[in-house]
Amino acid sequence: MENSDDIRLIVKIAQLYYEQDMTQAQIARELGIYRTTISRLLKRGRDQGIVTIAINYDYNENLWLEQQVKQKFGLKDVVVVSGNDEDEDTQLAMMGLHGAQLLDRLLEPGDIVGFSWGRAVSALVENLPQAGQSRQLICVPIIGGPSGKLKSRYHVNTLTYSAAAKLKGESHLADFPALLDNPLIRNGIMQSQHFKTISAYWDNLDVALVGIGSPAIRDGANWHAFYGGEESDDLNARQVAGDICSRFFDIHGAMVETNMSEKTLSIEMNKLKQARYSIGIAMSEEKYSGIVGALRGKYINCLVTNSSTAELLLK
């Protein structure tokens, strides 16, 4: 243990630094001590229990879950919201709010930002703050439009346009569907100048915001609204766990070819993986296998989810 003079000095430095908010340089000048000595004595004060730092985890009760999921899957960022006792709409709104804060924090001037479709992505876009000034962002869809009658608020073009308006960015929209009747039609659209313009942005994507689908929810209204009458019986037979932008994968993250693959117009997963940030937003036990597959395949490097889903991911 230090002698009494050393302890008195450590206490004095700690009081100036932590309670009076003086910088280490200011303390060094006031006490006539090298700044490196100030730093060393502050560390010694913490190590010996002279100084203790308390964090009020009531403000983020899910921090442990976030850290564990981040470490387990090697992610860049994780946001876990509470709400296990809340209804689904409330939990989704909370995910949208905190996801919007994450996206806004990660964006850099000049970024190309890609959007998929769906309820979760819509919840995030709705909660984006109105930008005070432009960051010269370019917002683009990374999948075509629905085959069925999807609610406009979940449509990829609606989300892309709305996000660009809030972020004071530039938007480009998709005038092609995600699923075509046959590969010949798809290949023809891929030769169009419009598609080439959109796909060029996919090649240089900086940030992506995606929902995660699962065959477990294919009886839901939004699945039918997006895919229309497209045959999907082969998904279970091929052990599909989930999809991002209608690109299907198994629970290990390996891509799975389906009868839709050659008729799909959306970003390819190798391009999605090249983005600086690929943010997945999803929750629920039904989507668990899809989320796990997306994480294992490294198709996303950031995750926004709820606490019950995060707990499942750690089992």
Which residues does each predicted region cover?
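Conserved phosphate- and dinucleotide-binding cores of soluble alpha/beta proteins
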Residues: 2-14, 19-32, 37-43, 49-57, ...
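Structural beta-sheet core signal
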Residues: 115, 139-141, 173, 280
